[in-house]
């Protein structure tokens, strides 16, 4: 069995360099919610050094709230903004001898695209326009995954080690109880259940079916690095290969 481990980088966390030794894919902030041209260059350089797949992490234009504010923008605006961000990272990667492999939206852009078909279409169309060979990463079973498949893109369905799930397989919103899993044992058990058995227990007790092709590790938690190391070790014990 194989699984991809991804982390969001270039967002001001001190643990970026160490996380890049543990993950197989890096989602690099492109300036709209965090980061700038220099952090993008630095993250790309470290990803290449560690053999980690380079990906763009586009967002709504929302640096004030770290890309976590809901926005209702016209699809053409989202298309242009997404194309702008992924095009910038693709060029930075190419200039350093690397290749951008995937795109994963950030924050509220990711969450809204999971449920809003027009928004999902705008993102998928931008990814396809930039490079049809790019992989589109989205929440397992979401509108974004469906949109990517409609454009013929390779998609990668994502699950979260440290997020609570609702009965329909969507994430518990961050402003609601149960959104974040603080207990390491619970997060580890949830991750293994999703990867090995394709299901997750919701906060209301029901089992939701999920397809786990990539697991997101958040680098901003207090014990993020320790958990990442433990997860890698557990995967190795279970014979699960970590690779993009």
Curated annotation (Swiss-Prot):
InterPro entries: Glyco_hydro/deAcase_b/a-brl, LamB/YcsF/PxpA-like. GO terms for molecular function: 5-oxoprolinase (ATP-hydrolyzing) activity; ATP binding. It holds the Pfam family LamB_YcsF. It catalyses: 5-oxo-L-proline + ATP + 2 H2O = L-glutamate + ADP + phosphate + H(+). Its EC number is 3.5.2.9. Coiled coil: none annotated. The keyword Hydrolase applies. GO terms for biological process: carbohydrate metabolic process. It comes from the Bacteria. Keywords: ATP-binding, Hydrolase, Nucleotide-binding. Catalyzes the cleavage of 5-oxoproline to form L-glutamate coupled to the hydrolysis of ATP to ADP and inorganic phosphate. Forms a complex composed of PxpA, PxpB and PxpC. Belongs to the LamB/PxpA family. HAMAP family: PxpA. This is 5-oxoprolinase subunit A. It comes from Shigella dysenteriae serotype 1 (strain Sd197). The gene is pxpA.
């Amino acid at each position: 069995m194989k699984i991809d481990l991804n982390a969001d980088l270039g967002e001001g966390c001190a643990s970026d360099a160490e996380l890049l030794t543990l993950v197989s894919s890096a989602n690099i902030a492109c300036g709209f919610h965090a980061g700038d041209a220099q952090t993008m260059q630095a993250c790309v350089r470290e990803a290449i050094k560690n053999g980690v797949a380079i990906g763009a992490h586009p967002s709504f234009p929302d640096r004030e709230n770290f890309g976590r504010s809901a926005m209702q923008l016209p699809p053409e605006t989202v298309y242009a903004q997404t194309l702008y961000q992924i095009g910038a990272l693709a060029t930075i990667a190419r200039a350093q001898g690397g290749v951008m492999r995937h795109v994963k939206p950030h924050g509220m852009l990711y969450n809204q695209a999971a449920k809003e078909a027009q928004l999902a279409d705008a993102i998928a169309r931008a990814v396809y326009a930039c490079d049809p060979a790019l992989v589109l990463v989205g929440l397992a079973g979401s509108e974004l995954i469906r949109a990517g498949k409609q454009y013929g893109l390779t998609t990668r369905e994502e699950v979260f080690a440290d997020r609570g799930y609702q009965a329909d397989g969507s994430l518990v919103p961050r402003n609601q109880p149960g959104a974040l899993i603080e207990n390491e044992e619970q997060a580890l058990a949830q991750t293994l259940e999703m990867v090995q058995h394709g299901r997750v227990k919701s906060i209301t007790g029901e089992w939701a079916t999920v397809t786990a092709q990539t697991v997101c590790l958040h680098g901003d938690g207090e014990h993020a690095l320790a958990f990442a190391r433990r997860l890698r070790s557990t995967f190795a014990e279970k014979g699960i290969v970590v690779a993009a």
